[in-house]
Regions:
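Intrinsic-disorder/low-complexity detector
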Residues: 1-131
Length: 131
């Protein structure tokens, strides 16, 4: 299923936020080392479903050290900005610790797939410009 950017369901938006946090951290890790380790977003997924607002704040705090690393990297900065935009879309009334429905997983997966397609397109464009 393709990413639905018009979906305003609370669980779906929180799922997209989780995918953004994961991607920003993963990108910063890749800049520092080739070692692939589990991101904070991946480790916190179970807690995220039960207490999404509190876990989002925790993940935001854990991303802070990575932000200086990605300062000049447009793709990752855009993903961080998307995360902030999605939090804003939730609004105060939906930014709560009420547990998420299963729809969060669809938002998470769809956003990750959109990032994957974006990465593949970017690689394809950079390869064709080198030729």
């Amino acid at each position: 299923m393709a990413l639905d950017e018009t979906c305003r369901d609370r669980s779906y938006l929180f799922g997209r936020i989780l995918a953004c946090a994961e991607q920003v951290e993963r990108y910063a890790q890749n800049l520092a080392t080739d070692e692939k380790r589990t991101t904070n977003a991946e480790r916190a997924q179970v807690m995220f479903v039960q207490r999404p607002a509190k876990t989002t704040v925790l993940l935001q705090n854990k991303l802070t050290p990575y932000l200086s690393r990605i300062q000049s990297k447009n793709g990752s900065r855009r993903r961080y900005q998307l995360m902030l935009d999605l939090i804003d879309q939730l609004g105060e009334e939906n930014f709560t610790n009420k547990p998420l429905s299963e729809l969060y997983l669809l938002g998470y997966s769809s956003q990750r797939m959109a990032f994957r397609r974006e990465n593949e397109e970017s690689k394809k464009n950079s390869n064709s410009s080198e030729e």
